[in-house]
Amino acid sequence: MILAIARKEFLDAWRDGRFRIAAAVVLVLLGVALLLAWQQVQRTRAEHNAAAALERENWLNQGEKNSHSAGHYGVYVFKPLARLAVFDRGLEPFVGTTVFLEAHRQNQAAFLPAQDATAMRRFGELTAATGLQLLVPLLIVLLTFGALAGERERGTLRQVLSLGVRPRDLVLGKALGLGAALAVLLLPAAGCGALALAQLPGGDVGGGWARLAWMGAAYALYLAAILAVCLAVSAIASTARAALAILLVCWAANAVLAPRLASDFAQRILPTPKLVDFETAMNKAVQEGLDGHNPRNDRLQAFAQATLKKHGKTRIEELPFNFNGLVMLESERMANEVFDHHFGKLWDHLEAQDRTVTWTGLIAPLLGLRSASMALAGTDFTHHRHFSVAAEQHRRDFVRVLNEDMMNTPAADGHHGGVAGRALWEKLPAFRYDPPPPAHALRAATPGLLVLFLWAAGAWTALLLVAPRLKPN
């Protein structure tokens, strides 16, 4: 009986001209969004590759200079764009894509893509992800609002139940048929999208296919929950018009109201520190120590005395190496401890904000889906943090090599560490970023996936509880 009802609902859905038109519009929008994003990712990658090549040439051709001065000359490194950013751009437009690496400082990523955008960005950006998150649920609303309430109004519900059809079988049959209609619409589109992503060369986030599979599961849970909620509302609403009104209000609350309220809530309970306060505290810690009572000069003087004692010397000039280079190494080590503490604390705070927003998804499933989708696409904050840590490690490695060269080079011609040239610059490799494995993304996506699972389980449980109470009047 359930399969017979499902077959009828499936055929009725596809015979409905309104559904076909709405489905065509959604598919066109998804296709256009995917195509535009594909072109943008290609263009951005080309720009980054060209800029990286030019930056490498500038580094190699900077001329002869003191090796520590080369550390202040610095290099720019560029964040590679994940392949799945074609589908879900996540935070990419709002976090920096370029980091300047230099001695003594850990800089944050700069040059946000959103800074170059028009004022229209405030209304959101159409991507394939936002299409599935917002437009497909609206399509489900239009498909299901009259599934049960409409039959009640027309009097056909009484006739069906009088034939001995159990209310639960009727509800499950309709759910199966309407779900199949959506699957026939979305699965081929998803397959075409996956093939398009496969054609995008290079720059992949690790384990792209595993990430894509988990992303598919996340969206399936989300749409399954939406379908169950819509059918439950249609089952209890007195009229189809009432069901449509209720579902449109729920859609607007989920799509528009909940993200803003969740963001404001997270900001209220976990306020983001001001940039000027963060930098002031970090600079103070560099000069006075993390405890605020250990001045940098005192620490360096103690280090100098310990070095002399270690080598059995009484004067700096008697040391068998250039002490200025060793001081630079120690100065970097002390500063790095401060950077690790302050940036680690800041990043932990921002991740706590994200988790707060994700768990508020218990009242709006879109929040859980966005969190899981961005994490699996490699465009969330945890992936940005991973890149920032990799860039900082590259900075420390290249500054260490420069300072070691300075330490091993006698001072000459007024330079603290002699003069270095292209031979040294070529020893420093260009920055190469290795993205994290799928396990990293799955850990970041777990809270969102759990929220979606709870929503799907709760929605279908509610639908099964409502079904036996289905009445003709």
Where are these regions (language model features)?
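Helix-loop-helix units of permease transmembrane domains in multi-pass membrane transporters
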Residues: 4-15, 142-184, 467, 471-472
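Selective transmembrane-helix segments that form parts of the transport pathway or gating/packing helices
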Residues: 22, 127, 135-136, 143, ...
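Hydrophobic alpha-helical transmembrane segments of polytopic membrane proteins
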Residues: 214-237, 459-460
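Hydrophobic/aromatic residues in alpha-helical transmembrane segments
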Residues: 140-144, 192, 225, 229, ...
